[in-house]
């Protein structure tokens, strides 16, 4: 085991000098004793002259030149398998929940090759989420990739928590949750939410929070992914939740300049597309098992053309766009039904009835959008009878797209609802065909199925 010494420390980036004949390979892990702590470094570049440039997987406070560094001669390895379920780990797979050792039987390196073409499999099966707007407008494929796009505070994390809860309870599969650069408070809430709904023993949690150095945030997504790959290779259907994929990009940006790379557009790292591709290509389904991934994507300044969300779009099967305008109307989940898309919304996959209903809902909402200007200037009275009907139905549809969440019961005070896909289609079809024209639009707000709306109307 070769040893070297630290020659330079700049923030999270540490240069280490080794003997010329024992230079560590790129992505190998190094260890340095920093006071009482053992700090892990990951090799990023070989600079020549026996010097390697590394990223610290923890705080580099207290490091000094001349400290001895050991080459572990393998990449960072993390525990995988059933022992990780119900536990909270950091980027190195060390437990941070004060519950003792993980007790794993196997450790895997976090850097792995993506599955080959022969191993890949595609599936047309739908994954029912119980959330009306998602199941109807942008259905998820089992083994597909979903992005939740939204600016700050429109509900990405709450939507994700609801998805995990619904899928864990209704489908009883394993999930891996990678918290990448998010708030520690959310991580804590998330753990307690999972414990309260009794699904914690089906979820592995890996956290690299906002307050941690960029090295942790850059690699924690790979740690979570490696755990998910193990479950997949055992022949399971596993869910991988990443909150937030933008922070993964951001951590790369933070270390990119320190690693001596020229910045590209908007100051992002020049390797943005490649880093995203390396991660996304591993999140895939094979003939053995499937990984369905749901990724929250923060949209800086609500600008979907920013290089980071724009790069993410290319990898996804379904995009759920959360809109600030819809949130400001008090409609939650604040999913924009005209902006959200899914490759699965195809009559050959979802069936003709589902397809026609979804497209019908979109056309009514689109027409309402066009009429809004006329209403604002001239008022409702100037519209034709036909348009008045469209507006009335559109407003009912808009309210019916809202739904009380289980994970938000504490805030809303109303019990959560899981709505089966057939009930969702029946409800929206009925509204479009005019079966519920006699009901007031308030009856459709924050209910589950259409039957609840009818009941609510009797009380109004």
Curated annotation (Swiss-Prot):
User: Which parts of the sequence bind ATP?
Assistant: 150-157
PANTHER family registered for this protein in UniProt: ATP SYNTHASE (PTHR15184), ATP SYNTHASE SUBUNIT BETA, MITOCHONDRIAL (PTHR15184:SF71)
Q: What is this protein called?
A: ATP synthase subunit beta
| NCBIfam families per record | atpD
Q: Which gene encodes it?
A: atpD
Q: Name one GO cellular component term.
A: proton-transporting ATP synthase complex
Where is it located? Cell inner membrane
- Family, per the entry? Belongs to the ATPase alpha/beta chains family.
Catalytic activity, EC: 7.1.2.2
